[in-house]
């Protein structure tokens, strides 16, 4: 399909939306929640609307969601859920639009992640306020804080393995496994937009501790699985494991909150998130370690 964009005739290639080439893709449950976005991207493609503007719009939807949760208006949970889903949907339009246009950037990458962080903090505070206000039990602040920390750690867990995989496949180059500021980043900032570096520093401040914790957990698991350094690529290229942990992504977390908000079961959502979803993720890690050790033992026996 041919469009006129900025005075030039350009073709729309839906395949460019994907983060991974066909042969490297795996089943990602998150794609079920926003499958309609390809049509929205197609509509936006020839317009002057930018991916970063979509990110800002997703921020507005997220702020509206948090506001509705604590507003006390009739059907507050329903409206909170509606705007939260709008945030989720738009959050997956901006990146796809950037990839289709070939305008991905480090600025957009950090803006998107920092928007996710801010909205997540506010929404979880709002949900906790609702529980405390409706029950009169301040103990729910502990449950809300545990839910927030769990949400961040599960999402970082998924992203850690996803970026390790995509970096080896050779796609999704705007993300790095370690986003710590390097000498190269400082040098690049001198001749480019300084906001790239500013957002990167802020990103490291809010996400760095999560990345370090997941990195240490992964190192422990590799030791338990007896993975030598020269076989790390195989460890991070397990598509079945990536498919299995995809429900831990922030997107699915938000969809769960949307569903339980519509059901009026915010407490149950937090309990399931903290208990079941953590056990689910740890169970998959245990399975990965056990499978790896079993396969290595088979190879030893064959020799």
Language-model regions, residue ranges each:
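Alpha-helical transmembrane segments
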Residues: 128, 133-134, 138-165
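Alpha-helical transmembrane segments of multipass membrane proteins
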Residues: 43, 63-67, 257-259
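Membrane-embedded alpha-helical segments that form the functional core of polytopic membrane enzymes
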Residues: 51-107, 124, 141-150
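Structural signal for membrane-spanning alpha-helices in multi-pass inner-membrane proteins
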Residues: 66-70, 123, 127, 261, ...
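Select subsegments of transmembrane alpha-helices in polytopic membrane proteins
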Residues: 51-56, 112-120, 241-251
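Juxtamembrane helix-capping/reentrant segments at transmembrane boundaries
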Residues: 98, 102-115, 176-177, 301-303
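C-terminal membrane-associated helical module and adjoining short loops/tails
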Residues: 2-36, 163-303
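Transmembrane helix interruption/hinge and helix-loop junction motifs
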Residues: 70-77, 135-138, 262-271
